[in-house]
Swiss-Prot record:
Cofactor binding note of this UniProt entry: Binds 3 Mg(2+) or Mn(2+) ions per subunit.
Keyword Cytoplasm: no
Boundaries of the annotated transit peptide in chain numbering: 1-45
GO BP annotations, alphabetical order: diterpenoid biosynthetic process; green leaf volatile biosynthetic process; terpenoid biosynthetic process
Subcellular location: Plastid, Chloroplast
Name of protein: (+)-3-carene synthase 1, chloroplastic
UniProt gene name: TPS-(+)3car1
Source organism: Pinus contorta
UniProt function note: Monoterpene synthase (TPS) involved in the biosynthesis of monoterpene natural products included in conifer oleoresin secretions and volatile emissions; these compounds contribute to biotic and abiotic stress defense against herbivores and pathogens. Catalyzes the conversion of (2E)-geranyl diphosphate (GPP) to (+)-car-3-ene and, to a lower extent, to terpinolene.
Residues bound to Mg(2+) 1: 377, 381
């Protein structure tokens, strides 16, 4: 019996009533602070035991070991997690608040075809849209958002937009805020609009008198610049100007809501931002009541709903995390001592990009897929011998449990958890897509493992490929395609072939997302990889192709490639002429954001840094104070 039958993949395992006991907020913080960072006990898979004894550690074979730290999250602690917010009364309260926030949207009501207030009606509508999105509650207000944006878009011009429909002049704050929101929602807007906010010398400039409004205007300009498309020079100029201005402003601004907003966007740019982390940060900012110029009553109502929604989903997260723990333990994953045990960190990222309670199947599929990728990565990169890896690659192509007969003992367990989990996810995908997708996923898996085998052969022979050879193979071995494909197929969103072609390999969307992940990952991991005997990386291959170049030269070149590809990925995601709507691409794009988040400053995955642990605590383990 596998975990698949013991703990269903679908959301049924998280729909049971929550444990009745309530952990108070302060008690939870104490528990987190004293959390033992060690693994306890051993686990036996119901079908095949994967133990350190059978993992080849004492089989006389010379093996490379990644030397990764153990799982940071104590089993007993994970199983003790509980929350009161799964009770139906909280859901009913949230429904009432949702109705009240809809009334706020409607309070900008239309009379005789026009909004009642002509002074700042446009900015008010944009403020509401921006706030519900940053607070992570926008899914409840899609109709209201569409009505608001359609109205504001009527007043959009080549020179931008003002605060209200009767404004005599356009202003940078409203224009930048509108530009960003319009682009993210698929409206056609040109970045040339920002040319009208340059001085006579053709440069962005700020007035001598710094004000909070001016700083916020530049802040929104910076946010708009982060969703630039290729060749949008004016947004490149805007980003440089805004970044310099805001960095200087942080030196003089008091600690306030605005300064914290600025720091957050500097820390987590759009392509690596997690919506749930942003929601937690913005909830904290609004709770401190430090943002001036916002409608106080409306802010309080939004904040009350955002806190409640955050905590309701927090209860969902705890049950899903416990489901994943059982899967991880049942298959004996803790006994694979050569791999990175990061199911908690992976779940944190996945639940950070999708906060819809009904999407449990998607989240669990995504985490399981990422954990399988990690097992394969560590097996091919370090632990497995080249002969063993060839056998495993051939067994995956056969896709039959009998293929384990020719495998070493430690590989048998790896093969079976891969086989059973992928097949079970394919069954879930068939329910959603109403067609068999297993063959499609198997081909992606074979391509992925084939790229791993090629890299293992390079390691075994000491071969350092050309940059282009390494890069093309690295896009496959990054794991982006397989981490994205299987989970999105479990969503209730239909993915017919013509839409899947725009997202999956060999689409430009997939190519750019995988490229960024490979390049960014290498810039963060190349030193540790080299220490383990993995000489091929984008840095070493670039230096081989360019004799006399330094590591700094290679990093500068690669970082430039990443910046260019981020703009290209923005275009593929948001382009208005694409066959696949933004809604269909959103989950694939957000998986990309989540994976990139791991490499924001360092390899926060192989070595779970303080930032990674803080992320887990803030977005999964700790509720917000109501």
């Amino acid at each position: 019996m596998s975990l698949i039958s013991a703990v269903p993949l679908a959301s049924s395992c998280v729909s049971k009533s929550l444990i009745s006991s309530v952990r108070e907020h302060t008690a939870l913080r104490r528990a987190i602070a004293t959390l033992q960072m060690s693994r306890r006990g051993k686990s036996v898979a119901a079908s095949i035991r994967m133990s350190s004894a059978t993992a080849g550690s004492d089989d006389g074979v010379k093996r490379r070991i990644g030397d990764y730290h153990s799982n940071l999250w104590d089993d007993n602690f994970i199983q003790s997690l509980s929350s009161p917010y799964g009770a139906s009364s909280y859901g009913e309260h949230a429904d009432r608040l949702i109705g009240e926030v809809k009334e706020i949207f409607n309070s900008f009501s239309i009379a005789d075809g026009e909004l009642i207030s002509p002074v700042n009606d446009l900015l008010q509508q944009l403020w509401m849209v921006d706030n519900v999105e940053r607070l992570g509650i926008d899914r409840h207000f899609q109709t209201e958002i569409k009505v608001a944006l359609d109205y504001v878009y009527r007043y959009w011009s080549e020179e931008g937009i003002g605060c209200g429909r009767d404004s005599a002049f356009t202003d940078l704050n409203t224009t930048a805020l509108a530009f960003r929101i319009f682009r993210l929602h698929g409206y056609t807007v040109s970045s040339d609009v920002f040319e009208h906010f340059k001085d006579q010398k053709g440069q962005f400039a700020a007035s001598a008198n710094d004000t909070e409004l001016q700083t916020r205007s530049v802040f929104n300009l910076f946010r708009a610049s982060l969703i630039a498309f290729p060749e949008e020079k004016v947004l490149e100029e805007a980003e440089k100007f805004a970044a310099a201005y805001l960095k200087a402003a942080l030196q003089t601004l008091p600690v306030s809501g605005l300064s914290r907003e600025i720091q957050y966007v500097f820390d987590y740019r759009w392509h690596s931002n997690l919506p749930r982390l942003e929601a937690r940060s913005y909830i904290d900012i609004l709770a401190d009541n430090t943002i001036s110029g916002t409608p106080d009553a409306n802010t309080k109502k939004l904040l009350e709903l955002a806190k409640l929604e955050f905590n309701i989903f927090h209860s969902v997260q705890q049950k899903e995390l416990q489901c994943l723990w059982r899967w991880w333990k049942e298959w004996g994953c803790p006994e694979l001592t050569f791999i990175r045990h990061r199911y908690v960190e992976f779940y944190t990222l996945v639940s950070g990009i999708d906060m819809v309670p009904e999407h449990a199947t998607f989240r669990l599929s995504c985490v399981k897929t990422c954990h399988l990728i990690t097992i394969l990565d560590d097996m091919y990169d370090t632990f497995g011998t080249i002969d063993e890896l060839r056998l495993f690659t051939a067994a995956v192509k056969r896709w039959d449990p009998s293929a384990t007969e020719c495998l070493p003992e430690y590989m048998k367990g790896v093969y079976m958890v891969l086989y059973e989990t992928v097949n079970e996810m394919a069954k879930e995908a068939q329910k959603s897509q109403r067609r068999d997708t297993l063959g499609y996923v198997r081909q992606a898996l074979e391509d992925y493992i084939g790229s791993y085998l090629k890299e293992a052969q390079w390691i075994a022979t000491g071969y350092v490929p050309t940059f282009q050879e390494y890069f093309e193979n690295g896009k496959l071995s990054s794991g982006h395609r397989i981490a994205t494909l299987q989970p999105i197929l479990t969503l209730s969103i239909p993915f017919p072939h013509h839409i899947l072609q725009e997202i999956d390999f060999p689409s430009k969307f997939n190519d750019y997302a995988a490229s960024i992940l490979r390049l960014r990952g290498d810039t963060r991991c190349y030193k540790a990889d080299s220490a383990r005997g993995e000489e091929a990386s984008c840095i070493s291959c670039y230096m081989k192709d360019n004799p006399g170049s330094t590591q700094e030269d290679a990093l500068n070149h690669i970082n430039g490639m990443i910046e260019d590809m981020i703009k290209k990925l923005n275009w593929e995601f948001l382009r208005p002429d694409n066959n696949a709507p933004i809604s269909s691409k959103k989950h694939a794009f957000n998986i990309s954001r989540g994976l990139h988040h791991f490499y924001n400053y360092r390899d926060g995955y192989s070595v779970a840094s303080k930032e990674t642990k803080d992320l887990v605590i803030k977005t999964v383990l700790e509720p917000v104070l109501m």
